[in-house]
Amino acid sequence: MTPFFIALQFLTRLKLVNQTEWTVEDFGKSVIAFPYVGLIIGLILALLYGVLSPFIPIMPLMLIIVVSEFLLTGGLHADGLMDTSDGLFSGRERERKLEIMKDSRIGSFGVVAFVFVTLLKWQLLAAIPTAEFIPMALIMMPLMSRWSMVFSIRSYPYAREQGMGAAFANLAPKHVITYNTISTFFMPIVLLIIGILLYTL
């Protein structure tokens, strides 16, 4: 199973290959494909916006976009946000914070953080002043966020010696930041050129 399909199945609900068991090595190497998965998420959101924008006002449409992203990704980012918020704002010592983050139950800080970030994302998308910029914003948002995941994995030490994050941190290719930074920079440029060509034809 290629790194791309592993990353796609891990970061989204899209399962082009039905496989649930991976080797630790393959799982760690899938980091290199994270931005490409972000690009796919962004293209789906931009397509959804293009289809619905003639019929739905901007405020409810952006709410649909935010909810669609949540459903498309399975809420993976939201789960991480809530766990992190519960741990960081618990006021406990380091080891206890890590235990709280690992706990599957959601605390009050996690709920507040999720609601706040969701409302903020909704309002920021709705506040984009020019409608022509919205599709590119919807593409760049998941693309850059998945690139930032790769950057964090390779740049910062993992808090635990074992776990899913350790596989990413220890087995991700050493050149992954350089490769993903270059590809992440050029992907939107290529899309912009294609969009301009299609618009002018």
Where are these regions (language model features)?
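Hydrophobic alpha-helical transmembrane segments
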Residues: 1-74, 92, 98, 103, ...
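Hydrophobic "anchor" residues on beta-strands that sit immediately upstream
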Residues: 79
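Catalytic P-loop NTPase motifs of RecA-like helicase/translocase cores
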Residues: 88-90
